[in-house]
């Protein structure tokens, strides 16, 4: 018995790949209805372009970034609600701000927790009300709003260099970036510029800072797709390896921060931007890490 393909699955696949309706239907039939495998199937056939990266959950809420005056400590928090109506509510926004303050003040924590329920924050005493936990404060917000309010994720960076932050004007994307090697005003400006670039997600949201940061499994998956596309292109066998190597190199250029072209000036890479700033400051600068939160993103 063949796989039953629903119109909803076809629509999801079309949105993710830009492929036609019948191509999407066939891809789902060939892959047993598995959307991820169908995306790969379409790409191998050359029907779909590289998937538009954006995990499109429809969550609303608030993202808050806090940075100390000396730019050495920062916090980033995402709190979700079900509707934009609640997300714009003053009490909800005050909750998000207060959670960010709680994270900022947690001197024992440094890093990123991508699933808040797996971290320690929700268990901590709530700094605004002794006797309650952070989880209690979030539950109270749910009760007041009538919506499922969720602390989604959070980050706290402590740096001996500088931390730059950028929050997009719509409040749906925010970034922290930690740069080591100095803390002059020029380096703070660099940190802001790099954070702004990461927020823009152009050409892609970086998978890592350098090529070695990109998981091998992702690179091998892409290489496999490029190899099949090359074989299907009808081009001479003796040039296929060179074509594939070029595509893999382009993948790295698009997906690693230091290789990316700067969003403000595409004649310069982020690596060059950092090197130029270091030369001006008389310091060897390193982008140590970053955190990027986009509203509702998986």
Annotated model-derived regions:
Residues 2-298:
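N-terminal assembly/interaction segments in proteins that build large macromolecular machines
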């Amino acid at each position: 018995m063949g796989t039953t393909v629903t119109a909803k699955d076809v629509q999801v696949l079309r949105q993710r790949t830009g492929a036609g309706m019948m191509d999407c239907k066939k891809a789902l039939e060939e892959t047993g209805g598995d959307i991820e495998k169908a995306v790969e199937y379409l790409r191998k056939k050359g029907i779909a372009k590289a998937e538009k990266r954006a995990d499109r959950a429809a969550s609303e809420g608030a993202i808050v970034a806090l940075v100390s005056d000396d730019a050495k400590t920062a916090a980033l928090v995402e709190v979700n609600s079900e509707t934009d109506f609640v997300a714009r509510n003053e009490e909800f926004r005050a909750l998000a701000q207060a959670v960010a303050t709680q994270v900022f003040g947690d001197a024992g924590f440094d890093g990123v927790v991508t699933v808040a329920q797996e971290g320690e924050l929700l268990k901590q005493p709530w700094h605004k009300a002794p006797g309650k936990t952070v989880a209690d404060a979030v539950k109270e917000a749910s009760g007041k709003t009538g919506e499922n309010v969720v602390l989604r994720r959070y980050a706290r960076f402590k740096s001996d260099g500088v931390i730059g932050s950028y929050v997009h004007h719509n409040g749906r994307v925010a970034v922290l970036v930690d740069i080591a090697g100095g803390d002059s005003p020029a380096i703070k400006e660099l940190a802001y510029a790099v954070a702004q670039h990461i927020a823009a997600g152009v050409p892609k949201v970086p998978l890592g800072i350098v090529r070695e940061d990109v998981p091998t499994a992702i690179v091998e998956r892409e290489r496999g797709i490029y190899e099949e596309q090359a074989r299907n292109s009808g081009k001479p066998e003796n040039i296929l390896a060179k074509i594939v190597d070029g595509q893999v190199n382009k993948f790295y250029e698009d997906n690693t921060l230091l290789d990316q072209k700067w969003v403000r000036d595409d004649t310069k890479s982020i690596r060059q931007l950092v090197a130029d700033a270091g030369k001006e400051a008389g310091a060897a600068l390193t982008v140590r890490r970053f955190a990027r939160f986009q509203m509702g993103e998986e």
